[in-house]
């Protein structure tokens, strides 16, 4: 613990004892989802929001019961906006887009938001705003206002904030602000950036990787062991993003090896953590259908730059980089059909609370049984509604403090 009684910030693995985590309790942004926009906003269905909140509250309570400090993004955001004028300006600037709204409406909306109380502004920045909710009169001299339907968004909602893993991650004692690939999620990083830059809890936190234009998402980043990072490249993270991240962590001496792992560009495997996560210091839960074909390019830091080797089989490349003989692999599901079903339902997307202790969705019965048969303690949570955005316990959590391995 530091002088404030909080755990020191940072993480050097996926499985070190979890001390503090950033979550986002689902809110009004999920109520913005409709059959017309859910695909654009990256949800497969329309969640029952009250039940999603109940499921998330149970998830947070489970973490607290295991001694984990739970930080809620909306609370941190409201506190930051209330304490920092610079944070308020930054948040409004990211949300109000003159290219979409035109100069007149953008100016009037920004002026209005500057006077909104911090808790209300926090809600607007996360849940968005429609034209019907504008304080600006309908007959204002704005063609944009007159031509839009009242239910159209002036500020888009951010339903994927639920998945706090993607917009930032900690590596060593530093935090990386990522660059999200799809338009529906781009603005999320502005909110995490505001919190890490201006909230007192994170005062002095140094950056590992500033948000580059080449996409990198936290769900594609696994801290396999101290100094060893795996980065998935597929639907979200690009080769350019992975290379930029590798060079950044090498320059800051946060890693000596980065494994770049190509994955299928498909909804079911949008991130590396949808097909593989760490459950112990030497064990992963992995989708068996890709086990024999998953490969990795190994990037090493060298005195005069970097070296790139491969592609080699992922499991052997990872074990070599981690300095262990072999990774234990626990398969998803029971057979090919069950494996495919449970992978789709985030059976691979576990959150480790300590070596050999993970949180998983209860619905993935066969995968959870396999984990327990391999000596892993499985803490089950409901996820019938939370899973509609295609994310599990790991996706919904950003560890900000883990004990080092």
Swiss-Prot record:
One of its GO terms (molecular function) is arginine deiminase activity. Keywords: Arginine metabolism, Cytoplasm, Hydrolase. Signal peptide: none annotated. Its main location: cytoplasm. One of its GO terms (biological process) is arginine deiminase pathway. InterPro entries: Arg_deiminase (IPR003876). It is found in: Cytoplasm. Pfam families: ADI. The keyword Hydrolase applies. It is an enzyme of class 3 (hydrolase). It comes from the Bacteria. Belongs to the arginine deiminase family. This is Arginine deiminase. It comes from Rhodococcus opacus (strain B4).
């Amino acid at each position: 613990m530091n002088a404030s009684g909080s755990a020191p910030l940072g993480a050097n693995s996926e499985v070190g004892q979890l001390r503090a985590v950033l979550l986002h309790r689902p809110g009004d942004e999920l109520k913005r989802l409709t059959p017309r926009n859910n695909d654009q906003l990256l949800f497969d269905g329309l969640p029952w929001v009250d039940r999603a909140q109940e499921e998330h509250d149970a998830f947070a309570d489970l973490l607290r019961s295991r001694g984990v400090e739970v930080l809620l993004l909306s609370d941190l955001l409201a506190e930051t906006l209330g304490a920092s004028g610079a944070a308020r300006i930054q948040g409004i600037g990211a949300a109000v887009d003159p290219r979409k709204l035109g100069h007149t409406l953008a100016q009037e909306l920004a002026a209005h938001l500057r006077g909104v109380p911090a808790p209300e502004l926090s809600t607007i920045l996360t849940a968005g705003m429609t034209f019907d909710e504008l304080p600006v009169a309908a007959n204002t001299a704005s063609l944009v206002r007159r031509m839009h339907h009242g239910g159209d968004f002036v500020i888009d909602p951010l339903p994927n904030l639920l998945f706090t893993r993607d917009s930032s991650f900690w590596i060593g004692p530093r935090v990386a602000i990522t660059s999200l690939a799809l338009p529906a999620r781009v603005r999320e990083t502005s909110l995490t950036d505001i919190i890490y830059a201006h909230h007192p809890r994170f005062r002095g936190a140094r950056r590992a990787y500033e948000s580059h234009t080449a996409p990198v998402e936290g769900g594609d980043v696994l801290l396999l062991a101290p100094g060893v990072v795996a980065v998935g490249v597929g639907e979200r993270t690009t080769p350019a993003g992975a290379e930029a991240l590798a060079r950044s962590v090498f320059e800051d001496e946060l890693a000596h090896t980065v494994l770049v792992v190509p994955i299928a560009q498909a909804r079911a495997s949008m991130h590396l953590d949808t097909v593989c996560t760490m459950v112990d210091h030497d064990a992963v839960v992995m989708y068996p259908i890709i086990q024999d074909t998953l490969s990795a390019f190994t990037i090493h830091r060298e005195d005069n730059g970097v070296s790139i080797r491969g592609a080699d089989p992922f499991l052997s490349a990872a074990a070599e980089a981690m300095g262990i003989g072999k990774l234990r692999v626990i398969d998803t599901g029971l057979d090919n059909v069950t494996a495919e079903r449970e992978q789709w339902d985030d059976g691979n997307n576990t959150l480790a609370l300590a070596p050999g202790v993970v949180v998983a969705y209860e619905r993935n019965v066969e995968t959870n049984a396999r984990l327990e048969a391999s000596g892993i303690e499985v803490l089950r949570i409901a996820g019938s509604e939370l899973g509609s955005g295609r994310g599990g316990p790991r996706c919904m959590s950003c560890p900000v403090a883990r004990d080092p391995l």
